[in-house]
Amino acid sequence: MSYAEKYEQQMKEFLQVCRRLSENMYVTSHGGNLAWRLEQDLILITPTKLNKGDIRREDLVFIDLNGKRIEGQREPTGETPMYLNFFGQRKDISSVIHCHPPFTNAFAVMQGENRLMRPTFPETTTEVGPVPVVPYGEPLTQKLADNFLPFLRKYNAFLMENHGLVIMSPEGIYRTLELIEILEVTSQSLVAALSCGEIKEISREDVQDLDNTMRTRNLPLFGAPGEIKSLVDLYFA
């Protein structure tokens, strides 16, 4: 049995997410890419040089953790080295999406304080977490992939400086899309608020309450397992 047959349902979901990203204008032209680890050494990934809204089942590619194409007719995305870093450094991660949602991307080019590192809305604080800016590296290069290394074990969402967003999740590809949508709505609200005045953050005490709620519900913290002890440490250390 081929991998395309074995993972037919996952490929359908993957394509649905590709189309949703395109419809939401989170990706345009050939921009953005997605990857989903289906087995320890098997990754489903988008091909290079295709609009995500136009990708079909036969365009998808299976690669291993060395970047070798295992199945599929097309070449994998040129950002494959970046994804290999992600999956190699974070054994807990199942899916990753890189895209360019416009309001979130505003913070990738904004000078001054990065407001996405601060707690402003409960849902974003507990589900997405802080979003650090990864220093600029030319797209499709090993340098860009390496620039993530100081951040990978502590966070699950990242802004590539002057480039775009990366979000990863220990769950499936659709959940990662949901996290992008949560963050983009938050970013839109922050951009609107900044045009009117100052941002009001969630207090340390209220973040502690959110942390207690996460523990009660057995929700995982961000970053590699065991790396972060509490939301308070993450936002206020």
Language model: regions and residue ranges:
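Glycine-rich flexible loops
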Residues: 1-237
